[in-house]
Design a protein with these regions (language model features):
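Alpha-helical segment proximal to the catalytic Tyr-Lys
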Residues: 123, 168-169, 233
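Substrate-binding pocket helix/loop in short-chain dehydrogenase/reductase
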Residues: 80, 94-95, 102-107, 201, ...
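Conserved mid-core segment of classical short-chain dehydrogenase/reductases
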Residues: 67, 90-104, 147-151, 191, ...
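Active-site helix of classical SDR
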Residues: 118, 155, 163
Length: 251
């Protein structure tokens, strides 16, 4: 029986790489994103490679839409085997400009957005006695802070709490919940000079990473694929740092 995986923020970056990785192992992948062109593009790539995928537009701030997407998948396939809660934003905002609205906007997507997708899918997973949930945190949520990103660090630290709480609550029902805390990964977000390191900053950081480079989206996707597999059957409640050794080498 083909496994069914739902991924948020799957149009670009880590989400896109994860969609392709799970499709390559044989999953039917439901690609969701607010970026419709990017989402449909990765679906086409997966299909061209012989995999199964579909696109559904989803803004994770929309509770009703999240419920509808989950219900539609469960109605057609009978289940969702894996949820990868990946959608997120990371905008640089100096503290004096960090209004309640900007704080809430980040939390609404980066933390609450995960709950909106997970919550309606849990009943079916519990009834079947199986399921894997993987949430994307960040090294800024588990290891250190970064100036002008206090809202992002706080939200990603909240993801760690979400993973632990859900793991305990759902473990007795056969549902595993884990997380990944990526380090510096070569995505459009990282290469943005407005909100992150930019190309030159990325090169500088890569030079101090013990493994000698910044990460690629595939480096994270492979860990997500492991956590979603039976190879991780006795692993739950953990957030795995994948940063090329940056935090142990520098902090």
């Amino acid at each position: 029986m083909t496994s069914v995986s739902l991924i948020t923020g799957a149009g670009i970056g880590i989400g896109r790489a994860t969609a392709k990785a799970l499709a390559a192992r044989g999953d039917h992948v439901v690609v969701t994103d607010v970026l419709e062109d990017d989402g449909r593009s990765v679906v086409q790539e997966i299909r061209n490679a012989g995999g199964e995928a579909e696109f559904q537009h989803l803004d994770v701030r929309d509770t009703d839409r999240a419920k509808a997407v989950v219900k539609d998948i469960e109605t057609r396939f009978g289940r969702i085997d894996t949820i990868v809660a990946n959608a997120g934003i990371a905008h640089r905002v100096p503290l004096e400009q960090l209004t309640d609205e900007k704080w809430d906007h980040t939390f609404d997507i980066d933390l609450k957005g995960m709950l909106r997708v997970i919550r309606p899918a849990v009943a079916n997973m519990k009834a079947r006695g199986s399921g894997a949930i993987v949430c994307l945190s960040s090294i800024m949520g588990v290891a250190y802070g970064w100036d002008e990103h206090v809202h992002y660090s706080s939200a990603k630290a909240g993801v760690v709490g979400l993973v632990r709480g859900l793991a305990v609550e759902l473990g007795g029902h056969g549902v595993r919940v884990n997380g990944v805390a990526p380090g510096y990964i070569r995505t459009a977000q990282l290469l943005s000079e407005k909100h992150s390191l930019g190309p030159e900053g990325a090169k500088t950081v890569g030079d101090i990473v013990p493994l000698g480079r910044i990460g690629q989206p595939d480096d994270i996707a492979d860990v997500v694929k492991f956590l979603a597999s039976d190879a991780a059957r006795y692993l739950t409640g953990q957030v795995i740092t994948v940063d090329g050794g940056l935090t142990v080498g520098r902090y």
